[in-house]
């Protein structure tokens, strides 16, 4: 998620949990992937993503994940073409930073 949006697009909210989480994690501004939101978006809009071939996901001792394709694998990962990446980013900036109708 773009740090510039975190800094400017949520002013309507006072203390927004997404903004506060980003600030607590690291000194602003910085851009950061948002895997949890991507997985939610995949449930709602699967056409915005691709899905990898089957494989196995392993987590190492430092917490890094690795995907190894294998025909008998039970895992897949979401994939994005450059066009899909741009569309997802635009969607997130537009939807996540907009003021909910309840508060307009």
What are these regions (language model features)?
Residues 1-104:
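N-terminal acidic, glycine/proline-rich low-complexity segments
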């Amino acid at each position: 998620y773009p740090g510039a949006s975190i800094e400017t697009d949520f002013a309507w909210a006072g203390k927004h949990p997404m903004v506060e989480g980003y600030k607590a994690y690291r000194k602003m501004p910085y851009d950061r992937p948002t895997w949890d939101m991507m997985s939610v978006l995949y449930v709602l809009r699967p056409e915005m993503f691709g899905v990898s071939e089957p494989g196995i996901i392993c987590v190492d001792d430092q917490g890094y994940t690795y995907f190894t394709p294998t025909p008998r694998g039970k895992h897949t990962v979401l994939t994005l073409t450059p066009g899909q990446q741009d569309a997802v980013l635009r969607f997130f900036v537009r939807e996540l930073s907009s003021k909910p109708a309840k508060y307009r």
